[in-house]
């Protein structure tokens, strides 16, 4: 288990790519219901395996809108994040990322990765 607080460059690059992929997909496929965009904030724990596949997503702080929470999970599950490089693989089989999602009118989806929910 390696948290985003890890300062090694190899992990920093991977976490930045993970964050950008989530934001790009979430902004492109912004959650909607009945033709109206859904806005809010939530916190999700994401578990990624060494092949870059998403093993699990768990909402630890809801947006208050179950549909938005489910759509955020679907965005993450639809992605592949790339295989761990050799340095990462020697240290971990999977990583657990705590991510704060902000779906906003102005900026689309913004995420912030941390090691604490």
Where are the model-predicted features located?
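Short, small/polar residue-rich loop motifs at catalytic or cofactor-binding pockets
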Residues: 37-42
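Intrinsic disorder
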Residues: 5, 9-13
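Surface-exposed patches in mature extracellular/periplasmic domains of secreted proteins
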Residues: 30-35, 87
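A short acidic/small-residue loop/turn micro-motif
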Residues: 61-67
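Stable alpha-helical elements in mature extracytoplasmic
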Residues: 14, 18, 68-72
């Amino acid at each position: 288990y390696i948290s985003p607080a890890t300062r090694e460059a190899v992990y920093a690059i991977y976490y930045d790519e993970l964050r950008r992929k989530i934001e790009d997909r979430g902004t492109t496929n912004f959650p909607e219901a009945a033709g109206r965009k859904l806005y809010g904030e939530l916190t999700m724990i994401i578990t990624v395996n060494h092949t870059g596949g998403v093993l699990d997503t768990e909402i630890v702080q809801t947006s208050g809108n179950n549909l938005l929470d489910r759509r955020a999970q679907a965005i993450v599950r639809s992605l592949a994040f790339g295989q761990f490089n050799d340095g990462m693989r020697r240290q971990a089989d999977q990583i657990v990322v705590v991510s704060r999602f902000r779906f906003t009118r102005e900026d689309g989806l913004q995420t912030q990765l941390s090691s604490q929910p």
